[in-house]
């Protein structure tokens, strides 16, 4: 008797959907049958385009991830497909290894979303799956006859090669005399980062390791984490603090004063350090990046790494040094790039380590804050309102589409006035004074995201706080 009679029906009945990047849902809905259904459908879609006999598999530190991985591995075995399990590693480490081995991969991770949720990310042998692949996975009708959940034996190869990818770029330990704090919490890469930075010459201080899962969101850094960073920087005399989200594909980096950098500013500095010609970024990124001051071409996309990756195809026709990054800090290398006469192969998926290393390399004879202060002054801020369903978020955006004045009044900005809107992803409103407010539904969880941009940080923060406070008050009426 089949455990999964029809993978399409099992997935549909689970209520789990593809979000901004990967399939996301409640842990209780990711049953072994649902994990198996996603796995066999993914394999079927990949077999239409690629020849392979093995799939790579890895997990983050969420308590539910190992059991989900066991179900995925069991489904692969049922289909006669081998599995290499790389244990707990950052998502980009799995992606790099699987691309090097020309095989598909599955990452069990919920990234930064709340504890009670989890997810599955899928990789083709040539990188992240596309939105077209996602649709194909949801339409496949396949079966799984037997699921035997076995202990998974860990291979260290992905972790070793991920560290080597970056240490091989530098012939000298350029971080000598630098003190780097690693905010470890429950990050999937927490056991890799210390040896990586030590190999580059740094004195490393381990900070904030947690036995419980901590869903760090690099676009909505908590007040507690801001205070921690400032305290650590002072107590340990740090030159920088490095951290990531849960699965290690979004960086969180603080300067010598413990001030966390915005992800898009980090991406800009990394792109400049790499001497990039063309850049693909979501529309939510700081507008100074697309101002024409830094790059030959900037392509604006919807929010989500699949859209950034899709833009690489267009950019590669005219440019040879291509990168992409997001407001969350995740950095995507769209082409091979030579660094210190060493070739760094393209890695078209979000990565947290490359932007950190290039920022530290660029600031090796100065400070991180000095590099940031050289940029034009334009500030962004973002936060989220949790527990807001996608339907409710979309109804807010529809309100703005039908009558912008009504939306501005609803979010407490009725006296601001708007001069333009952009509907590329959600609703991005340019106000009369040139400030920007951007609302969109999260693709990963029932959350409403709010982004703001202004010439003063306090102004950007006030716009986000006012907007979300008014929405929260009205939604709870």
Curated annotation (Swiss-Prot):
One of its GO terms (molecular function) is phosphomannomutase activity. Pathway: Nucleotide-sugar biosynthesis; GDP-alpha-D-mannose biosynthesis; alpha-D-mannose 1-phosphate from D-fructose 6-phosphate: step 2/2; Bacterial outer membrane biogenesis; LPS O-antigen biosynthesis. Binds 1 Mg(2+) ion per subunit. It catalyses: alpha-D-mannose 1-phosphate = D-mannose 6-phosphate. The active site is at 111 (phosphoserine intermediate). InterPro entries: A-D-PHexomutase_a/b/a-I (IPR005844), A-D-PHexomutase_a/b/a-I/II/III (IPR016055), A-D-PHexomutase_a/b/a-II (IPR005845), A-D-PHexomutase_C_sf (IPR036900), A-D-PHexomutase_CS (IPR016066), Phosphoglucosamine_mutase (IPR050060). It is an enzyme of class 5 (isomerase). It is found in: Cell membrane. It is a multi-pass membrane protein. One of its GO terms (cellular component) is plasma membrane. PROSITE patterns: PGM_PMM (PS00710). Its cofactor is Mg(2+). Its EC number is 5.4.2.8. Mg(2+) binds at residues 111, 245, 247, 249. Keywords: Cell membrane, Isomerase, Lipopolysaccharide biosynthesis, Magnesium, Membrane, Metal-binding, Phosphoprotein, Transmembrane, Transmembrane helix. The chain crosses the membrane at residues 30-46, 265-284. One of its GO terms (biological process) is O antigen biosynthetic process. Belongs to the phosphohexose mutase family. Involved in GDP-mannose biosynthesis which serves as the activated sugar nucleotide precursor for mannose residues in cell surface polysaccharides. This enzyme participates in synthesis of the LPS group B O antigen. This is Phosphomannomutase.
